[in-house]
């Protein structure tokens, strides 16, 4: 079993249109993201800066926002669902 990552529409330009990605081996959210960065060129620049998530990017594990858990060190296990959700602004 793998960790499923939900990719929002705003980021699909760098994932080749993929809406989901499976990460086979990871024990933290940071490792999940590293797996995505290895797979999708340009994703890191869209969601991270200086080794941390950009402030307008929220990541959820099982519906819980990781900033209220252990951040990038939040534990994940097989079967978990990780959602990346950049904030959308408009006027």
Each language-model region and where it sits:
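Ubiquitin-like/PB1-type beta-grasp interaction modules and other compact soluble beta-rich domains
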Residues: 1-90
């Amino acid at each position: 079993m793998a960790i499923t990552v939900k990719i929002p529409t705003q980021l699909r330009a760098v994932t080749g249109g993929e809406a989901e990605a499976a990460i086979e081996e990871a024990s933290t959210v940071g490792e999940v993201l590293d797996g995505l960065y290895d797979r999708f060129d340009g994703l890191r620049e869209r969601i991270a800066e200086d080794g941390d998530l950009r402030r307008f990017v929220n990541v959820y594990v099982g519906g819980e926002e990781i900033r209220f858990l252990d951040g990038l060190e939040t534990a994940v296990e097989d079967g978990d669902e990780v959602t990346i959700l950049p904030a959308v602004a408009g006027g």
